[in-house]
Amino acid sequence: MPPIVAPRILRATSAISSYLSHLSLQCALRRAARLARAPAFPYSSMPISALSTRFAPRARVCLRAAAVVATCTALAFAPAAHARKKPHKDARRAPVVSAAARDAGLPASVLVALQRAKVPASAMSVVVERVGDPQPLIAWNANRPMLPASTMKLVTTFAGLSILGPEFRWRTTAYADGPVDPDGTLQGNLYIKGTGDPKLVPEELIDLVDKIRKAGIKRVAGGLVLDKSYFAASTRDLPSFDDDVSAPYNVGPDPLLYAFKAISFTVTPGEDGKVAVDVLPPLANLSIDNQLYEGSGSCASAAAAARPTLNADGAMLTASFAGDYPLRCGARTTNLAILDHTTFFARGFLALWQQDGGTIAGPVAEGKVPSAARPIAVHHGPVLGSVVYDINKFSNNVMARNLFLTIGAVAGKPPATPEQSSRVIRAFLQKNGIAMPDLVLDNGSGLSRDEHVSALSLAALLQAANASPVAQAFVDSLPIAGIDGTMKNRLTNAGVLGNAHIKTGTLRDVRAIAGYVAGADGQSYVVVSFINDDHAEAARAAHDTLLEWIYAGAH
């Protein structure tokens, strides 16, 4: 078994991140600019000796420049899942915990970190294995079902890549049910049918709008009808996970998810004494009441001034800003989840449609596309491999939830439900001999108090993923310690810097890590660890210490 950092599938790669790093185009452009200045290869921080060990001669990796259109990422991926090989025999063996692994206990450095955080060792579970060998080196509370937080995304993304294939694309289709006059007026309704594209952002939706115009339609005499039948109605506009209903991480899934149903307000003071407010994405019927002025107050008070007060008056929504905003505080962006999915998509679509004088005379409604309607435009979203990259690098909940439901819809039959998706994923795991008897799926993102899995089960999935045809797309999607994603600011001065692909997980009272470590000894390791405790937030050092210990040789 080759080490996980030596890709088993030879293809070109790109490490340029996308729109997902933030919820606005402006933030994404800043991230793209930063990455453009970074080393071309994500392992550039490794010593030359490590690179020669890991990438020669088997993994002759060729890098090519990635063209960035706006903030989208161009990636090449492994063969589709329908061409997958027989799973590695080790992936089919149910994990067996030896007495030595059970008795090994936690490393002393990890115990010290737990003690400092006031977290008992009983609140932590750990499994460490060599890649290709499911016999654990450490198995601490290995079989205990735990809250995994966002490490549950590993189950959803590996299943998605394997079942749908890395080249899978979502489709968003426009239909018309009437004739188009010579002057460009559609005598009927315009229908938009979604299939759950997790990354339908402004620069993607404008492609659909342009194609509708190219079909000869300038005006719509009827209404705008949104077909959301791909997901069951029970999956949409759900209660938020916690009390912060405006937090983007709380946005639920939707077949016509647009811009993550979140709006970005950026406040920027200028040398002329004025304070500008910019909004992304543009929404119809949204007005800005800007009463900000450039003063000499504190930047702490400026944070409050940068957060708008939202007021609805019929169809109009007004975002009001007021107060002192000093020049020295610089630009500040506030991301808010607002409106319901239908209203958000409709207003986003109308804003783009109206830019070149387009009109829709009738109301916005939900409904199925009639059988007599004809397709007039289709937008294909980014490939699944790119979406999985964003889901795992930046731990995007709503993208994971849309992928989770898509798995059920494609492998089963629409409308998708969480139960249907869970059955499809369980059947996939069973077919491929991946033993996860304690797995409990809810929404596939980890943003749940109902999802559970043991460290031993998740380690079995990581072993199988590394031995699969989608190994490279999967491993490439995981944050690299000290380099990018949710691990960018961790272990930046440690030996493990650049030598671990780790998915993180965070909830109140939960901290989790899961992924792969390339050890200094030339061995590659699988690691999974969960901490479920009231003081879990203070125990991040225990996980960082564990990763350093593994990198040093796991002994």
Q: Where are the language model's segments positioned?
A:
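N-terminal secretory signal peptides that target proteins for export/translocation
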Residues: M1-V61
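Residue-level preference for non-acidic, small/hydrophobic
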Residues: P134, K153-G160, L224, L256, ...
